[in-house]
Curated annotation (Swiss-Prot):
The protein's Enzyme Commission number: 7.1.1.-
Residues that bind [4Fe-4S] cluster 1: 60, 63, 66, 109
Sorted UniProt keywords: 4Fe-4S, Cell inner membrane, Cell membrane, Iron, Iron-sulfur, Membrane, Metal-binding, NAD, Quinone, Repeat, Translocase, Ubiquinone
Reactions listed under catalytic activity: a quinone + NADH + 5 H(+)(in) = a quinol + NAD(+) + 4 H(+)(out)
Compartments where located: Cell inner membrane
Protein name: NADH-quinone oxidoreductase subunit I
Membrane-related topology note: Peripheral membrane protein
InterPro entries: 4Fe4S_Fe-S-bd, 4Fe4S_Fe_S_CS, NADH_quinone_OxRdtase_chainI
GO biological process, one term: aerobic respiration
């Protein structure tokens, strides 16, 4: 009985060594990261950014839908109002140490202000450095939707003008004409 157990043990060890040596000469899966580009899937969800509309204004209207949609509660913002009546976030903060990059904030945003980019290099030495303020998140361009302007598309009144009378604004849609 003991000899059979010893033979099984030696056989198991030899089989393990054989598997290790067979993998030693197989092609490597490891990439030398900075020198070799890492493949990211086309729909990869990475760093979150805040975009601007084509006119250069912030797209975010501080509706708070992104913060409500976030399952971990890593988004916080405070609404404020400009002189012309347009809302904007007084502060907009995302804690990336809690963010799970699910993309629900991007889906909830009616103005396409929040967009997820394929950037994945977010390593920091201190946890406090992963809390991004509005200035850190705001980019200079429109992101994925270069022609979209929420105020132009929504038909909201701008500066006290009736809907459809502002420059470059589409005429309001008659909802009753859409009925079958």
């Amino acid at each position: 009985m003991k000899i059979i157990n010893i033979i099984k043990g030696v056989g198991t060890q030899l089989r393990s060594l054989g598997m290790v040596f067979s993998h030693a000469w197989s092609p490597r899966e490891t990439l030398n990261y900075p020198e070799q580009a890492v493949y990211a899937a086309p729909r990869y969800r990475g760093r979150i950014v805040l975009t601007r509309d084509p006119d250069g204004d912030e797209r975010c209207v501080a509706c708070n839908l992104c913060a409500v949609a976030c399952p971990v509660g890593c988004i916080s913002l405070q609404k404020s109002e400009r002189e012309d009546g347009r809302w904007y976030p007084e502060f907009f903060r995302i804690n990336f140490s809690r963010c799970i990059f699910c993309g629900l904030c991007e889906e909830a945003c009616p103005t396409t202000a929040i967009q997820l980019t394929p950037d994945f290099e977010m390593g920091e030495y201190r946890r406090q450095d992963l809390v991004y303020e509005k200035e850190d998140l705001l980019i200079s361009g429109p992101g994925k939707y270069p022609d979209y302007n929420f105020y132009r598309m929504s038909g909201m009144a701008i500066d006290g003008k009736p809907k459809g009378d502002a420059e470059n604004e589409a005429k309001p849609i008659d909802v009753k004409s859409l009925l079958p």
